[in-house]
């Protein structure tokens, strides 16, 4: 069985939900961006009139481009600016700040309005932070070197004896743990270090979300291949959401913007532009 990267159409989920919703309060659905309680001048922003968005450094393709989130290139940069526009901000009103991935979802006050950084929505993280409605659904992928004995693997069971690694704090790391390999997962500070470990044959394979895996194989790891993809999110679809401070009064307005972008097809268009791949990747089970 194979499937393409565009496996889970979020817009369809939102449209079905909308179709099943009560028909009352239709005025809200046609409200202009940033109107009413979500008008820019009414928003509880970190800096009045300015939308502060966080992400990690470095910021990798295909989520961002040239490690510059402010250029609007890459899926997450484009999504961030689409959300900002939907909320009533001009591009010049957006300011970026750097926040390490594994500290973004820790409890406490945030110095940003929202963070966008392939952060999976989990019950555990929801205890410490808020999440928006999902803007992307992701599969995990296993990357090995072309000459690896695992390059011809066809099932997850084939990796029982493999040493696998992933970035600290990620769903990819939890996905490895779920495979119950003989060796404990190897943990790296970031994806770059994980890729270097694979290049140096210090690990049999690394796990990352599928779009990141495509980038790593194309640009970072010479002589590597994506063996396959698999779903893991504790039994639920893995979805990325914008992260906000716990109980942030901004959350409903961000949700309103993300939902609108899903329903009008913007998220699907951006996914097609920045994440679509012509190559099918086998599904590992």
Where do the protein language model's features map onto the residues?
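Extended ligand-binding regions for polar small-molecule ligands
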Residues: 21, 77, 81, 85-86, ...
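Extracytoplasmic small-molecule ligand-binding "clamshell" domains
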Residues: 33-115
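A ligand-binding cleft/hinge motif common to bilobed small-molecule-binding domains
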Residues: 103, 119-128, 177-178, 204-236
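Bacterial lipoprotein signal-peptidase II cleavage site
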Residues: 17-30
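Ligand-binding clefts/hinges and TM-proximal coupling segments of bilobed small-molecule sensing domains
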Residues: 28, 41-43, 172-185, 225-226, ...
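Periplasmic-binding protein-like
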Residues: 57, 137-144, 218-258, 277-285
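Bilobed "Venus flytrap"/periplasmic-binding protein-like clamshell domains
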Residues: 72-86, 119-120, 138-193, 208-215, ...
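Acidic, polar ligand-binding/catalytic clefts
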Residues: 93-156
């Amino acid at each position: 069985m194979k499937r393409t990267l565009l496996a889970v159409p979020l817009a369809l989920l939102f449209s079905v939900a909308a179709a099943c919703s009560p028909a009352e309060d239709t005025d809200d659905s046609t409200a202009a961006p940033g109107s009413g309680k979500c008008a820019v001048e009414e928003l509880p922003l970190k800096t009045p009139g300015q939308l502060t968005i966080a992400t990690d450094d470095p910021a990798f393709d295909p989520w961002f481009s040239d490690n510059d989130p402010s250029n609007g290139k890459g899926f997450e940069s484009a999504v961030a600016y689409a959300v900002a526009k939907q909320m009533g901000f001009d591009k010049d009103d957006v300011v970026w700040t750097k926040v390490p991935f594994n500290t973004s979802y820790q409890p406490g006050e945030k110095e940003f309005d929202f963070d966008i950084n392939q952060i999976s929505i989990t019950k555990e993280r929801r205890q410490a932070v808020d999440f928006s409605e999902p803007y992307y659904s992701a599969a995990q992928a296993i990357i090995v070197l072309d000459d690896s004995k695992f390059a011809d693997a066809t099932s997850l069971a084939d990796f029982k004896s493999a040493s696998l690694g992933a970035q600290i704090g990620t769903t990819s790391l939890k996905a490895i743990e779920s495979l119950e390999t003989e060796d404990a997962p190897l943990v790296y500070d970031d994806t770059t270090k994980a890729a270097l470990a694979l290049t140096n044959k210090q690990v049999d394979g690394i796990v990352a979300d599928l779009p990141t895996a495509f980038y790593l194989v194309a640009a970072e790891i010479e002589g590597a291949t994506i063996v396959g993809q698999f779903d893991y999110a504790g039994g639920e679809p893995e979805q990325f959401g914008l992260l906000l401070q716990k109980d942030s009064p901004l959350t409903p307005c961000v949700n309103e913007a993300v939902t609108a972008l899903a329903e009008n097809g913007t998220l699907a268009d951006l996914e097609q532009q920045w994440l679509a791949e012509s190559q099918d990747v086998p599904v590992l089970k």
